[in-house]
């Protein structure tokens, strides 16, 4: 017969200390903003007319799906986030949200974003969004990040898929153009994140994450940054001579590519001291501008062509 301690204190149920801002932080809003922008470009360059309501629904679902991926990523990485200065102030390491709450939040958003996109737009896009979430959470976060220095290279496919999903939402199919956007983002990802990893290598080493600078060393990472940047510049410029994007995009890609290449060469050349740190930080910052400007030109070109008949 069980013995009941009459003097035991009954603890009240746990009350979550999380605020709306904490749940919003789980969505990784900076990453989400880039996803929204690249997806918008994928939607806008698609042929034909997309009803504004369906277009808005598609972008919203892609954004929510990206946020859901971020929440699930944080739920799965709470143990390493607490060890890294860059992530130690996130809601889970600070104890404001539990990993279980973040997991439930992410799974709920994942379900509704995929189902809404499929039901209201088309299931081709819905399926691609589901695959994107699965790839980021299961393949990258659970499978690759803690096991291989190529985590960013392979996992970068998830971050490159939003414009493909948006194109599929607009057309119900795939074509060369969204695949070109995919390749640009895919080859942009390693130089961008390896530049970050170079000046955050102590963080990754402390958390046991096998980023390339930790596993292969900074010099090998600098070489890989340079090689991937060369490939990126070539792939980003290719759509112009191939006839997919016009000369405005082509010239912009060459100018921006020259900037990326110069900064990548500087990272490769400067290997010690404050000069090396400054070179990696400059490349990291410019890489964000590079991708934004490249996609902005495509978006502005579409808008200009839409407005021109109204003016002339």
UniProtKB/Swiss-Prot annotation:
Top-level EC class: transferase
InterPro entries linked to this entry: Protohaem_IX_farnesylTrfase (IPR006369), UbiA_prenyltransferase (IPR000537), UbiA_prenylTrfase_CS (IPR030470), UbiA_sf (IPR044878)
Annotated GO CC locations: plasma membrane
Membrane topology per record: Multi-pass membrane protein
UniProt pathway annotation: Porphyrin-containing compound metabolism; heme O biosynthesis; heme O from protoheme: step 1/1
MF terms in GO: protoheme IX farnesyltransferase activity
GO annotation, biological process: heme O biosynthetic process
Annotated Gene3D superfamilies: UbiA prenyltransferase
First-listed, main subcellular location of the protein, grouped into a coarse class: membrane
Enzyme Commission number(s) of this protein: 2.5.1.141
Ranges annotated as spanning the membrane: 34-54, 56-76, 119-139, 152-172, 179-199, 225-245, 247-267, 283-303
Protein location: Cell inner membrane
Keyword Electron transport: no
Catalytic activity: heme b + (2E,6E)-farnesyl diphosphate + H2O = Fe(II)-heme o + diphosphate
Keywords in alphabetical order: Cell inner membrane, Cell membrane, Heme biosynthesis, Membrane, Transferase, Transmembrane, Transmembrane helix
Top-level taxon in the UniProt lineage: Bacteria
Family recorded in the similarity comment: Belongs to the UbiA prenyltransferase family. Protoheme IX farnesyltransferase subfamily.
Function of the molecule: Converts heme B (protoheme IX) to heme O by substitution of the vinyl group on carbon 2 of heme B porphyrin ring with a hydroxyethyl farnesyl side group.
Family annotation (PANTHER family): 4-HYDROXYBENZOATE SOLANESYLTRANSFERASE (PTHR43448:SF7), PROTOHEME IX FARNESYLTRANSFERASE, MITOCHONDRIAL (PTHR43448)
Miscellaneous remark of the record: Carbon 2 of the heme B porphyrin ring is defined according to the Fischer nomenclature.
This protein's name: Protoheme IX farnesyltransferase
Gene source species: Nitrobacter hamburgensis (strain DSM 10229 / NCIMB 13809 / X14)
């Amino acid at each position: 017969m069980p013995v009941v301690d009459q003097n035991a204190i009954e603890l009240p149920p746990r009350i979550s200390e999380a605020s709306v801002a904490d749940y919003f932080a789980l969505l990784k809003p900076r990453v989400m903003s880039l996803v929204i922008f690249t997806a918008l470009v994928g939607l806008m360059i698609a042929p034909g007319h997309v009803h504004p309501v369906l277009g808005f629904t598609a972008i919203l679902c892609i954004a929510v799906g990206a946020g859901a991926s971020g929440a699930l990523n944080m739920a799965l990485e709470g143990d390493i986030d607490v060890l890294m200065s860059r992530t130690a102030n996130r809601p889970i390491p600070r104890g404001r949200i539990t990993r279980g709450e973040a997991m439930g939040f992410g799974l709920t958003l994942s379900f509704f974003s995929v189902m809404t996109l499929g039901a209201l737009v088309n299931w081709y896009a819905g399926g691609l969004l589901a695959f994107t979430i699965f790839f980021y959470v299961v393949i990258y976060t659970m499978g690759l990040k803690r096991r291989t220095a190529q985590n960013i290279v392979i996992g970068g496919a998830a971050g490159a898929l939003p414009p493909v999903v948006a194109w599929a939402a607009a057309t119900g199919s795939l074509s060369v153009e969204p695949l070109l956007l995919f390749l640009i983002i895919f080859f942009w990802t390693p130089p961008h994140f390896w530049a970050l990893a170079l000046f955050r290598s102590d963080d990754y080493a402390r958390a046991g994450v096998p980023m390339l600078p930790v596993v292969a060393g900074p010099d090998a990472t600098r070489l890989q940054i340079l090689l991937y940047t060369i490939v990126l510049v070539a792939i980003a410029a290719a759509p112009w001579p191939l006839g997919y994007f016009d000369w405005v995009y082509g010239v912009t890609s060459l100018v921006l590519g020259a900037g990326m290449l110069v900064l990548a060469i500087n990272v490769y050349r400067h290997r010690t001291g404050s000069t090396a740190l400054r070179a990696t930080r400059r490349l990291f910052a410019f890489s964000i501008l590079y991708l934004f400007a490249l996609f902005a030109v495509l978006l502005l070109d579409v808008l200009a062509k839409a407005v021109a008949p109204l003016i002339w």
